[in-house]
């Protein structure tokens, strides 16, 4: 058979690279490949921010958010941000012992995961938020416009922000509270608490393991649900991770008070700083969460 009789080969529909919007919006026909059965994922962003959008199947309010983000420039991309350069970055030292200053280093990207559930949405490990809540209108409008919401902007304006949007059909699961074993002293009905069976405290089930938990807020910390709230992840020096809820007008000192109330008797000689590179020390205790750009951020405890 001559080369003129050969039919042109059908282009492959590889999902590995970035596609144009015409490729993404093309409806699948009878001859479409089988890999188009799953939900499409789109990535939008630039030098300073990025967003991955997974196209859902149901038509509802969340559909509108995903579709508008796609229409404003979303393209298919990976869920995680591209890996940073593996080249050495650090401080040089001459043979004479003097340090050589290095150039400006690109801050690490800040990643936020927004999950849309059937009963609302969550940001990272924060509380469930309602789609019809007027307080969330500005946040959702930024998502529709493929923009980084203001409350997710990092303290370091040079740091790129990657916002991953995910869709789950089930309801957001309720958080399980940590069960604490009883460690008191038993007392018999006769009034005597002597004896090996009642005088010794009950041993815990196992050694304490730092887990993510949310202790009761301090007496001085009052959350006003009528004004904007935010969740801040606190990574303590012992490895424990706490997620605390604050109002935007709360201060850095209120964050310290929350940590101190969760660790009574612990040393108070520590410093708080934002996560990122370079880390930003939070030395002004009167600075509000909004002023410091700490909404939905991660704060580290350092001794």
UniProtKB/Swiss-Prot annotation:
Residues 1-107, 170-220 are annotated as: Disordered. It holds the Pfam family SEP. InterPro entries: NSFL1C_SEP_dom_sf, SEP_domain, Ubiquitin-like_domsf, UBX_dom. Residues 109-173 form the SEP domain. The modification Phosphoserine is found at residue 181. PROSITE patterns: SEP, UBX. SUPFAM superfamilies: NSFL1 (p97 ATPase) cofactor p47, SEP domain (SSF102848), Ubiquitin-like (SSF54236). GO terms for molecular function: ATPase binding. Keywords: Phosphoprotein, Ubl conjugation pathway. The gene is PUX4. This is Plant UBX domain-containing protein 4. Residues 225-302 form the UBX domain. One of its GO terms (cellular component) is cytosol. Interacts with CDC48A via its UBX domain.
């Amino acid at each position: 058979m001559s080369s003129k009789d050969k039919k042109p080969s059908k282009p492959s529909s590889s999902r590995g690279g970035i596609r144009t919007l015409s490729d993404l919006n093309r409806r699948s026909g009878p001859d479409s490949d089988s890999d188009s059965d799953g939900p499409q994922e789109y990535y939008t962003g630039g030098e300073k921010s990025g967003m991955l959008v997974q196209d859902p199947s149901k038509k509802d309010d969340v559909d509108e958010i995903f579709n508008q983000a796609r229409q404003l420039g979303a393209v298919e991309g990976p869920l995680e941000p591209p890996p940073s350069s593996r080249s050495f970055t650090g401080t040089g030292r001459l043979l004479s012992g003097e340090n050589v200053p290095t150039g400006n280093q690109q801050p690490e990207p800040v990643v936020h995961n927004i999950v849309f559930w059937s009963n609302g949405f969550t940001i990272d490990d924060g509380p469930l938020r309602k789609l019809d809540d007027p307080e969330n209108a500005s946040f959702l409008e930024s998502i529709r416009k493929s923009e980084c919401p203001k409350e997710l902007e990092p303290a370091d304006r040079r740091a790129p922000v990657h916002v991953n949007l995910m869709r789950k059909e089930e309801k957001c699961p309720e958080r399980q509270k940590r069960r604490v074993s009883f460690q008191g002293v038993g007392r018999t009905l006769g009034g005597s608490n002597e004896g090996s069976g009642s005088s010794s405290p009950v041993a815990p089930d196992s050694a304490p393991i730092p887990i993510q938990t949310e202790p009761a807020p301090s007496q001085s910390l009052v959350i006003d649900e009528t004004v904007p709230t935010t969740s801040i992840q606190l990574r303590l020096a012992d490895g424990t991770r706490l997620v605390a809820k604050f109002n935007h007008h709360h201060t850095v000192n209120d964050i310290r008070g929350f940590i101190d109330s969760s660790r009574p008797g612990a040393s108070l000689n520590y410093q708080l700083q934002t996560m990122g590179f370079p880390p930003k020390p939070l030395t002004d205790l009167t600075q509000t969460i909004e002023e410091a750009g700490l909404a939905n951020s991660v704060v580290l405890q350092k001794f």
